[in-house]
């Protein structure tokens, strides 16, 4: 019998290390790179529209295809169009006022920059919307993402895990389902930013 090395990094830790190294190698992706990522995400949604609806229905026990399209799929597609339209402006430096009495002749600028690796904890309700819409703005901002799905979204998580690697490399995006206490470990990872949708009580755990 071979014993596992307790000091060996977990799959989550390895994923974070991979993405952080990729971020440090290319910390400020170009406008063209970000647009390409957004179009790739939109292509994934369009090419798997029916599969996304089927996965949601399986996870819910039953859910109207029209509800999923109207509440989740179409808003995600439209959100990407919105980001593509405004991305160039979002990336431009923004001027800020200066206290001219103390800093006469000085100028201020805020330069938008990626933060690095962003974690996303997705709830069971509206999980397509609450995973793909955050990814839209994570990629628009030039970041990388690790996504943890709900234990009640097994079919959707499996769809993501099976299909998304054909669209994004692991150093850009990885998705995890809720197995073996993944949620607790995921929430404790030292992300550069963490997005969580849920109750305040759960968020404090």
Region roles according to the model:
Residues 1-108:
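N-terminal Rossmann-like NAD(P)+-binding subdomain of aldehyde/semialdehyde dehydrogenases
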Residues 101-205:
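Rossmann-like NAD(P) dinucleotide-binding subdomain of oxidoreductase/dehydrogenase enzymes
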């Amino acid at each position: 019998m071979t014993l596992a090395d307790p000091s060996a990094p977990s799959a989550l830790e390895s994923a974070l290390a991979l993405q952080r190294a990729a971020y440090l190698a290319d910390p400020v992706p170009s406008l063209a790179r970000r647009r390409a990522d957004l179009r790739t995400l939109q292509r994934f949604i369009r090419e798997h529209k029916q599969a996304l609806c089927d996965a949601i229905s399986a996870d819910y026990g039953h859910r109207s295809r029209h509800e999923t399209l109207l509440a989740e799929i179409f808003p995600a597609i439209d959100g990407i169009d919105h980001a593509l339209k405004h991305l160039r402006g979002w990336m431009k430096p923004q001027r800020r006022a200066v206290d001219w009495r103390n800093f006469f002749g000085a100028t201020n600028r805020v330069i938008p920059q990626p933060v690095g690796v962003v974690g996303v904890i997705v709830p069971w309700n509206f999980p397509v919307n609450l995973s793909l819409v955050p990814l839209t703005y994570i990629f628009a901002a030039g970041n990388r993402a690790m996504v943890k799905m709900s234990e009640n979204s097994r079919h959707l998580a499996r769809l993501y895990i099976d299909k998304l690697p054909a669209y994004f490399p692991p150093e850009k995006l990885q998705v995890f389902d809720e197995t073996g206490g993944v949620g607790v470990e995921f929430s404790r990872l030292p992300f550069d930013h963490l997005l969580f949708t849920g109750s305040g009580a759960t968020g404090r755990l």
